[in-house]
Amino acid sequence: MKRNIYSKLWMIFFVLMGAACTNQVEDAIPVSGQPIEFSVQSDWKEIPNTRLNDVNGTMTFTRNDEIQIFGFHTSPSNVVQKFMYREGDQNRGQIVTYDGTSWNYSPKRFWPKEGTLDFYASYPQNSIHNDADHRMMIYEQTAISMKQDLLWGVSIKKCADDRKKNVEITMKHALAKVNIFLDKSWGDIGTVMFWAYTAGRFTETDTDGIPKWIFNDSDKTPFNAVFGYNDLLRDDSGTSLTVFILPGNITGFQMFDVPHPNEDGKKIVGSDDISKELQKKTFKAGQAYKLTIRRAQKNTNSRSIAMSVRCVSE
């Protein structure tokens, strides 16, 4: 009998300890009994590698899509504390999943009784991490991440006034979307590569909700983003590639033909000329661009590059 009583007491103890571990923030900040709920939408238009649908002009997520949300609480005395984050990793946001009707997460967070809450959301859920001591958000850019857009949303709420309503977040394009089209005059292209920043960071957004990107010296150390044969789209008119890049210039552009067996692809003549032209263009976050690059015949002995760049609405 005593053994059973001790076992039950130990079980209660561990449950209470678990509750304490999962609610350390709430213990430090007086909270109400009102859980924090979310309503998330996006200005996203249909782009490669996404599953978002356009329903009567309103962009919606689909079932099982995940975002991450960071939350920061500011007390009436202006003390700022990280309030919502991922269990086991305070530098990542809380994963919030769409079930087709509503957004859900666990463990639940509850509205503080006073102060304000700043919410920051990103998609995909593994795209952004947070500086340990500040609100600095950091995005690490790779050739893989360039194949998918980054969405970012901000919502600032007053705890006492807004806690009975869902937190509404509208997510915005945070990167520059660049579609590069190379017409058939360039032949069969096997690989495209260029230099890119390794990372970007921000603490603020502009009036449209787009991150104000800044770059440390280490962020500007370029890596070579390589896109192989299977990353390129082809049709009778030419070859295209769509990338989502941190704002700035495209430098170091090179392209290679399709290699023969046991050989490397050969650099296509004209790559350096394209690179020089691309460096003249600055690509802005939140904008979509269409680049068309042709080989223009000047005379029988020489060729020049004909490039058009236009900003397209989505």
What do these predicted ranges mean?
Residues K2-W10:
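Bacterial N-terminal signal peptides that target proteins for export
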Residues W10-V15, A174-A176:
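Outer/extracellular conduits and scaffolds centered on Gram-negative outer-membrane beta-barrels
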Residues M17-A20:
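C-terminal motif of bacterial Sec signal peptides marking the signal peptidase cleavage site
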Residues N23:
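Short, conserved catalytic or interaction motifs in soluble domains
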Residues D27-D188, M193, G228, D235-P259, ...:
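Short, low-hydrophobicity acidic/polar segments
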Residues G187-L233:
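Acidic/polar low-complexity flexible segments
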Residues L278-T282, T300-S302:
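Short proline/glycine-enriched turn/loop segments at secondary-structure junctions
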Residues K298-E314:
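C-terminal, surface-exposed recognition/capping segments
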